[in-house]
Amino acid sequence: MKSLLDEMQQCKSIKDCIELALVDAYGDDEQATAWLTCIEEMFGRFDRVKVLGQEVALEGFDLADGVAVIAVCRQGKRRARVALESVEFPDLTPIEARWLKAWKQFSRGLG
């Protein structure tokens, strides 16, 4: 049986990514949780990202208001929950870039 990450890496288009993310996800809560799971799988390898041009530690991902995937970041003693759209991931692979575009498209209501 394929792992979720293996299946995610087989997606050839943004539409494929969105369809895979939302398989068996009904309602806003389930869709948000499904996206959170996919984002954690695809971007869990990153421990450093940029927010507003500053390098910060990426501690993980979470949901805001139950519907938006956010990044949990830390710089020194300060911790922030940041919209995923505001996070710059270094050296994205083409599939990672595709999944990030898919999330952005879906989160803007275009998916």
PLM regions and their residue ranges:
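Long, low-complexity intrinsically disordered regions
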Residues: 3-4, 21, 97-111
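Short coil-to-beta-strand transition motifs
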Residues: 47-57
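Mixed-charge, Lys/Arg-rich low-complexity intrinsically disordered regions
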Residues: 1-46
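Residue-level recognition of beta-strand microenvironments
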Residues: 59-61
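Short aromatic-glycine-enriched beta-strand elements
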Residues: 65-72
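A short macromolecule-binding patch
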Residues: 78-88
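Glycine-centered tight beta-turn/hairpin loop motif at sheet-sheet or coil-to-beta transitions
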Residues: 51-53, 75-79
